[in-house]
């Protein structure tokens, strides 16, 4: 009789490698390992071999890099979605896609369950499982680290588990940072970062970005072309999404841009400190905001600023496949219809500065904005505007004076006595 199948989100790391024999021993399932390439830069042939040697019945490697950029990163970019002012959502944007692909393989294989190796303290367990619930509410989810049958409390126990069974151990016992990498970012947690008073050891930590102080002093100029809010060209050359982001990561990395050290609020209730390398992403966000400044009117831009916070929160919390997220993105897509043009930035020792922008949809009109007098704007027009714009303040002051409290209220407003000489 054929065994039931479980689809495992397999990264090739220690946790998910241990989970393969653990699932077979504790659930008697055939394990279907699914590796999803979102730009980790891993040796997928070696990882597939490891999964099969460790006991997986099958292992599939999915190149999802293009899909990840175009369907997850670009929407977040168009929305200017930044979590808690700094985090560009590198891990958060990848998890909904991974969850969706896991469901697709579960359906294809006729699996009864999906398993992941996310810890019980992190955000990823939430993100994976919300995606699974959105597409396959009938499927069982096995979260190994929360399972009653899981009796390993750390790396040493996991290594011992594999060694006892004569299986390959995909890492050494020495300490290292806990990292998550994809085409958009690289995150670092653990070691000295677990104490907030410690400065990050950037020289030891960084992989894709130079320490800003060691970046070239002359800096570098970059021009990004946008069509409806989506990056389509770099320095005058049309490029596909993967090539463009790959090249921008190199350019940003050698100029030390996109480093973030943040103590963020996890959706599970605790704070967590991490250092993020997002060199290409930082450039794109800066350039895209330049385009929004140029092409969006005041009311739309200000409302989008508020909405961006909510979109970032939804992405961070794993609520990508929700009605609210779809509704927010419908607004974002409307705002981006005219965000077409180019933005030029200068990168220098970790800093990004604007160096010009242009668009046929630009709402900047030099003849109006110029300090010289022109036909389109009469300085005297401001008089009526100021009268009406300031009317609420004037009416309130008149009321205060009429009720006999005017002088007391005026004196309470912390006015200073100024010198008269």
Can you annotate each of these PLM segments?
Residues 2-9, 14-421:
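Nucleotide-activated chemistry modules centered on ATP-dependent adenylation/adenylyltransferase
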């Amino acid at each position: 009789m054929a065994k039931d199948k479980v689809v495992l989100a397999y990264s090739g790391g220690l946790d998910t490698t241990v989970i393969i024999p653990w699932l077979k021993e504790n659930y008697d399932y055939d394990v279907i390992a699914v590796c999803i390439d979102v730009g980790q830069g891993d040796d997928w042939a070696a990882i597939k071999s490891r999964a099969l040697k460790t006991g997986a019945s099958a292992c599939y490697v999915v190149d999802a890099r293009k899909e990840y950029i175009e369907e997850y990163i670009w929407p977040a970019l168009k929305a200017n979605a930044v979590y808690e002012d700094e985090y560009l959502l590198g891990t958060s944007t990848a998890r909904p896609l991974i969850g969706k692909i896991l469901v697709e393989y579960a359906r294809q294989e006729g699996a009864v369950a999906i398993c992941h190796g996310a810890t019980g303290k992190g955000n990823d367990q939430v993100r994976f499982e919300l995606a699974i619930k959105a597409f396959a509410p009938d499927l069982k989810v096995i979260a190994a680290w929360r399972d009653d049958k899981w009796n390993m409390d750390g790396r040493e126990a996991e290594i011992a588990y594999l060694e006892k069974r004569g299986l390959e151990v995909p890492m050494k016992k020495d300490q290292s940072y806990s990292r998550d990498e994809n085409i958009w970012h690289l995150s670092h947690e653990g070691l000295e970062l677990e104490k907030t008073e410690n400065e990050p050891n950037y020289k030891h930590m960084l992989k894709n970005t130079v320490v800003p102080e060691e970046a070239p002093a002359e800096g570098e100029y970059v021009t990004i072309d946008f069509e409806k809010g989506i990056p389509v060209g770099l320095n005058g050359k049309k490029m596909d999404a993967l090539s463009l982001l790959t090249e921008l990561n190199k350019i940003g990395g050698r100029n030390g841009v996109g480093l973030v050290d943040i103590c963020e609020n996890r959706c599970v209730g605790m704070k967590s400190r991490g250092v993020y390398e997002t060199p290409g992403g930082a450039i794109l966000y800066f350039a895209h905001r330049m385009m929004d400044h140029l092409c969006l009117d005041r009311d739309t831009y200000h409302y989008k600023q508020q909405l961006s916070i909510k979109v970032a929160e939804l992405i961070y919390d794993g609520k990508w496949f929700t009605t609210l997220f779809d509704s927010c993105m419908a607004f974002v897509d409307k705002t981006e219809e005219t965000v077409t043009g180019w933005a030029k930035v200068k990168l220098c020792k970790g800093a990004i500065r604007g160096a010009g922008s242009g668009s046929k949809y630009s709402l900047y009109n030099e003849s109006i904005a110029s300090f010289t007098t022109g036909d389109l704007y009469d300085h005297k027009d401001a008089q009526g505007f100021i009268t009406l714009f300031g009317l609420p303040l004037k009416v309130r002051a008149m009321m205060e004076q009429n009720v006999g409290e005017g002088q007391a209220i005026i004196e309470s407003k912390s006015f200073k006595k100024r010198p008269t000489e």
